[in-house]
Each structure stands twice: as C-alpha cells, then as structure tokens.
Regions:
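Juxtamembrane transition segments at transmembrane-helix termini in multipass membrane proteins
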Residues: 2-8, 42-43, 54-78, 98-108, ...
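Interfacial aromatic "cap" segments that immediately flank transmembrane helices
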Residues: 15-42, 112-139, 165-217
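Hydrophobic alpha-helical transmembrane segments of integral membrane proteins
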Residues: 131-134, 138-160, 207, 211, ...
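Alpha-helical transmembrane segments
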Residues: 75-91, 153-167, 247, 251
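Hydrophobic alpha-helical transmembrane segments
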Residues: 24-29, 33, 68-82, 99-106, ...
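Long, highly hydrophobic alpha-helical transmembrane signal-anchor segments
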Residues: 50-76, 117-156, 234
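Hydrophobic transmembrane alpha-helix segments characteristic of membrane transport
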Residues: 93-121
C-alpha cells in the first residue's frame, strides 16, 4: 500500500506542515536529486563561463548605492543569453522536481519522461506567472527608486509590508499551476484565494523554513572551512574549490526541500479552503 503524503487529512499546524515537508523531502530526495543536481549546475553556468573567460563575477564599479547596484546587476544579467538559457533550464527542472514529488506523495508511479514533458509543456505558463507575479510585487517597491539617499531606504522599508503581503498571496501560484494545470492568471487568483486569511500562518512557516536553510548553509560553510584547513594548506584555489563544491552539494539538497515545503503548504491550504467552503455550504440553508 503506497504511503500517501499529499494531501493531508486535515488542516495542519506550523509544526505539522514542516513535518509533512520533511516527510515528502525524505521520500522523494533520491528520485529528485538528479534534477536538483543538474539545476544547481545549470544555475552556475554564467558564473563558470565568466570565470573561464577571466571576467569578474561582480561588476567592477564601486557600490555607492546598493539598490541601484542590485538593479544594474540584474539588468546586466538579463542581457546575457547564457543567463536566460540557465534560467529556463532551472525553471524546467524545478517544475519537474515538484511534479515528481507530487506524484510520489500521492502514491502514483513516477516516470522521468512524464515529469520533464509536463514541465516543458507548462513552461510558458510558469514564465507568464513569474513575470506577472514579479510585476505585482515590484510595483509596490518601485516608487522608492524615485528618491535618493536615506529617504529611498526609508520608503523601501515602508513599502516592504504591502509587497510582502502580495508576495505571500501569490506564493502558491507556481505549485498551483503545475499541480492543477491552470493558466498563469487563474493560478494567481487561485493562490490568492487559498492564502487569504493565512498571512501570519504562512509568514511563520516561511520564516522557520528560511532559518532552517540559513542554518544548513552556515553548517556547510563550517564544514567547507574545516575541509579547507585540512586540505588546502593555504592554497586559495583549493579553498575556493572546496567551498564551491560544498555549497553546490548543499544547494542540491536544499532545492528538493524548498519544493517539498511548497507542496506541503499547498496541501494544507487546499484542505483548509475546502473545509471552509464546505462549512459555508452547510451553514447556508440554516441562515435562509
């Protein structure tokens, strides 16, 4: 009898959602690791190419304004065809990871060709969703760029609150699109409907998960430092290689956990919304 991990039988607490994410992660890690490994390597292709050509990984100009520097760096990346190719590969493989996790968590047999074919088929919808979601969030913080100096950062700090609300409301859009096959706009609307009224609940979940991932990367950094001391003997090239490989391994493991958490959150919100809708339908005749 297959072990059904999705959807949960009832609405869950924050701890139970994280536990569900870890159970999905453990059950699917080995079968998702090839996708995650290729995705992590693909994500590093622009940096590897620049290193091979002797180009600096970061822009050479001084950082006088952090926000402008980040924006200029992002615009520079978007002009790089290799960055677009790497981003498309990462997007497809990320979608394939969630689709495979959903298949395993629901107790159905998996097939690599099906996962990848579905991910590629839904790529246009995912890209449209990411663009629309990014614009919906960015429109709240763009006014900060009209100011300069400390006023820019003060306004940005104030605008982060509504931007965060929009980001959380749309956070389930990508999983919804992949699992249900809805279009980009329909997935965004469905995500907003699912997350409505659960802002603090989701904020706590994402915050705890972020702390766990930061702790994982910190531990990996310590391990890389120890290995560098033992193996490098002061050789900067060896230190860089050991650190890079360690971080890539951690990223390869962290990527499936990210998607397992997204799936666990989607399952909980779906059960919550279905329960609320059922309660509303049952109470409707009594109020008439």
């Amino acid at each position: 009898m297959p072990n059904i991990l999705y959807p949960p039988p009832r609405p869950q607490s924050v701890g139970e959602i994280l536990d569900s994410a870890f159970r999905i992660f453990r059950a699917t890690l080995l079968k998702c690791l090839p996708y995650a490994t290729v995705a992590v390597i693909a994500g590093q292709l622009p940096a590897l190419y620049n290193m091979a050509r002797g180009r600096p990984l970061l822009p050479p100009e001084p950082i006088s304004d952090l926000l402008s520097w980040v924006l200029n760096t992002w615009v520079r990346q978007m002009r790089d065809p290799l960055w677009w190719a790497a981003s498309l590969i990462v997007t497809v493989l990320g979608s394939a990871i969630l689709l495979r996790q959903h298949t395993i968590a629901t107790g159905r047999p998996t097939a690599t060709s099906v996962d990848l074919a579905t991910a590629v088929r839904r790529l246009p919808g995912v890209l449209a969703l990411l663009i629309l979601s990014g614009l919906a969030v960015a429109v709240w913080v763009l006014p900060a760029f009209a100011l300069h100096g400390s006023m820019r950062y003060l306004l940005l700090l104030l605008l982060l609150a509504p931007a965060s609300c929009v980001a959380i409301a749309l956070s389930c859009g990508w999983p919804v699109l992949l699992v249900t096959g809805k279009g980009a706009l329909a997935s965004m609307i469905h995500s907003t409907r699912l997350t409505w009224g659960s802002w603090w609940h989701l904020t706590l979940i994402y915050s705890v998960a972020a702390v766990l991932l930061v702790a994982l990367y910190a531990l990996a950094g310590v391990i890389a430092l120890v290995l560098s001391v033992l193996l490098a003997h002061g050789d900067i090239a060896v230190v860089t290689a050991v650190t890079t490989v360690t971080m890539l391994i951690v990223a390869g493991i962290g990527t499936p956990f990210f998607w397992a958490l997204a799936l666990a959150v989607l399952g909980d919100l779906t059960v919550r919304r279905e329960g609320a809708d059922l309660a509303q339908r049952l109470s409707a005749p009594a109020t008439q």
